[in-house]
Amino acid sequence: GVLILSGDHLYRMDYMDFVQSHRQRDAGISICCLPIDGSRASDFGLMKIDDTGRVISFSEKPRGADLKEMEEAEKKPYIASMGVYIFKKEILLNLLRWRFPTANDFGSEIIPAAAREINVKAYLFNDYWEDIGTIKSFFEANLALAEQPSKFSFYDASKPMYTSRRNLPPSMISGSKITDSIISHGCFLDKCRVEHSVVGIRSRIGSNVHLKDTVMLGADFYETDMERGDQLAEGKVPIGIGENTSIQNCIIDKNARIGKNVTIANAEGVQEADRASEGFHIRSGITVVLKNSVIADGLVI
């Protein structure tokens, strides 16, 4: 069989259980799925399944009347596709080469048609899973990691998560107050306040900075003290967040330079804005400071 995964999901799963289920039920295609409530139903591919677990209908991100048709019953959850599939190799090759040679998407093009003629089985996954393919979902999933108890944990010793080795030193935190937050390696925090936020590697946060409900992705490199001093002397902004700055409900991308006395709060509640020339966008009410951008001293967003 061929296992197909998506790259923008957060979950922990033993694929062997999924593979065993696929083999035991002699499925042509198996779809990993999970129950969700009606408020999120139109964001996912939804399935109808029979008593044997066979998928008898599939609709990718349905709305309106199509959404009503996909509801199992008034009090039962929707069954949503996770975008994780196993195909018998010969079935996959036949679908891609002959049936759908121009198709670009499994969920919206291949699976709905295949469900009508191939033995497609649903495999129920009952653990944590989150699609982080949008700005809003990425933001919320990151902040949820800082909550206690967290729905998803990177600290399960029996099921460790592996990432790139960076050989960074521990973070240096001086005179700061940090609550319900995650601070990565190699950071410098000086007399700041960090609430319900995630702070990425090599981040620099200056004195009297207030960070709240913010995902700061950090930096790819360090600037030396001399480089930072020269930039400040020339009126430029070093990487990190300058002193007396307040930021909330924000994603700060890598290598961003945010000056002193900046306020990022979106006080007017703008939902969507494209301000790339000024170094930021607003998506779903969340301010996104762009990678390598410069936010000048004193700017209010």
Curated annotation (Swiss-Prot):
Organism expressing this protein natively: Triticum aestivum (Wheat)
Name of the protein this chain belongs to: Glucose-1-phosphate adenylyltransferase large subunit
PROSITE patterns according to UniProt: ADP_GLC_PYROPHOSPH_3
Role played: This protein plays a role in synthesis of starch. It catalyzes the synthesis of the activated glycosyl donor, ADP-glucose from Glc-1-P and ATP.
Catalytic function, reaction form: alpha-D-glucose 1-phosphate + ATP + H(+) = ADP-alpha-D-glucose + diphosphate
UniProt xrefs under Gene3D superfamilies: Hexapeptide repeat proteins, Spore Coat Polysaccharide Biosynthesis Protein SpsA, Chain A
Family under the similarity heading: Belongs to the bacterial/plant glucose-1-phosphate adenylyltransferase family.
Pfam family, one: LbH_GLGC
Record's subcellular location: Plastid, Chloroplast; Plastid, Amyloplast
Protein origin, superkingdom: Eukaryota
Entries under SUPFAM superfamilies matching the protein: Nucleotide-diphospho-sugar transferases (SSF53448), Trimeric LpxA-like enzymes (SSF51161)
